[in-house]
Amino acid sequence: MNSVLVIDDDPVFCNVVEGILHHDGYAVTTAGDAQTGISRFGELNPDLVIVDILMPGKEGMATILELREANPEARILAITGGGNFAAGEVLRIAELLGADNSLKKPFEPAALLASVKRCLAA
């Protein structure tokens, strides 16, 4: 069973993603902020980390860099709704910084599962 860590400040979003992934056979852990997520990453060494780019405090770009520094082989899926920025541009930058794939919110469950599978296959 593949393990996934979801780092997002929106608890409802975390619950939805956890449900989708759990239903598809993934073991899921969530973190409501970047620091907690980075700690859990070190403890759990998950197969994939899903990181929201726009979070209060330490934002997702810095989180991706820190995860990549801790483990260059980590699989990372960047997600964002864009906020005040163009989501496509934000996600392109996230991929340049080390995300293996990216996904714009909102998304359909099938799109999430396809992105997760692409990241894990990379």
Give the location of each predicted region.
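Acidic catalytic/metal-coordinating carboxylates
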Residues: G32-T36, E59-A62
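Short amphipathic alpha-helix used as the core "switch/output" element in two-component signaling
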Residues: S39, M61-E73
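Alpha4 helix (beta4-alpha4-beta5 surface) of REC/receiver domains from two-component response regulators
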Residues: A62, G83-L103, A110, A114
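Hydrophobic/aromatic residues positioned on beta-strands within the core alpha/beta folds
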Residues: I79-G81
